[in-house]
Amino acid sequence: MHTLVLLRHGQSAWNLENRFTGWTDVDLSPEGEQEARDAARLLTDEGLTFDVCHTSVLTRAIRTLYIVQHEMGLSWLPVHKHWRLNERHYGGLQGLDKAETAARFGEEQVFEWRRSYDTPPPPLPADDPRSPAGDARYAGLAPDVLPASESLKETVARVLPYWHDVIAPQVLAGQRVLVAAHGNSLRALVMHLDGMTPEAVTKLNIPTGLPLVYTLDGTLRPLAHRYLGDPAVAEAKAKAVAAQGAARK
């Protein structure tokens, strides 16, 4: 049997402000930092430890991982950062208030952009200052690789090569792996691991700061998976994620 832990970053400054974030690089909020410390405690209480860690190239996921490592006394572990684990790119929605966007375009349209499987938000123009093209962390990538917007389907297609090429071989080799990433990049992994349909994954909400522990067999099929901590907390956090696209009443 193999162990894999998936962890969505703690609350970010823009989660707190209910803004579309995507590839925008924002930091954790104070609550997000505490969520990372709490995640470390849950992992320690469960008796879990790790051999290798993976995260995106975005600060909120990196800092979540570093806080967890520090709290667990595992700061020495190797960390692999990769853009393929980034959050879904929200295109022209990035930076906008989710509730105000719902009031402007309608909740149904915003739900389609946020939660559908194959509908991307409006793309960013190439010369938009929010474009990743001028960001040094993506300097080695061909311009046509960088997204201007992504559907969840496109996010899955971006994430899975990293799973197949890097993470899965480590898990199969017996390494205990922690992946600290984002709501949609983790939805992509969960969809693959659990064999979820596109319709099912649109209803999946990943709560912030709660470790999701998978026990996998020798072919990486899930034998069990669960969030650590109080199930009621996980359910409440997942419902809060689902409600983010609603207009203010």
Swiss-Prot record:
One GO biological process term: gluconeogenesis
Xref: InterPro entries: His_Pase_superF_clade-1, His_PPase_superfam, PG/BPGM_mutase_AS, Phosphogly_mut1
Annotated signal peptide: none
Catalytic activity as recorded in UniProt: (2R)-2-phosphoglycerate = (2R)-3-phosphoglycerate
EC number: 5.4.2.11
Protein origin, superkingdom: Bacteria
Protein task: Catalyzes the interconversion of 2-phosphoglycerate and 3-phosphoglycerate.
NCBIfam families linked to this entry: pgm_1, PRK14115.1
Protein's name in the database: 2,3-bisphosphoglycerate-dependent phosphoglycerate mutase
Protein's organism: Nitratidesulfovibrio vulgaris (strain DSM 19637 / Miyazaki F)
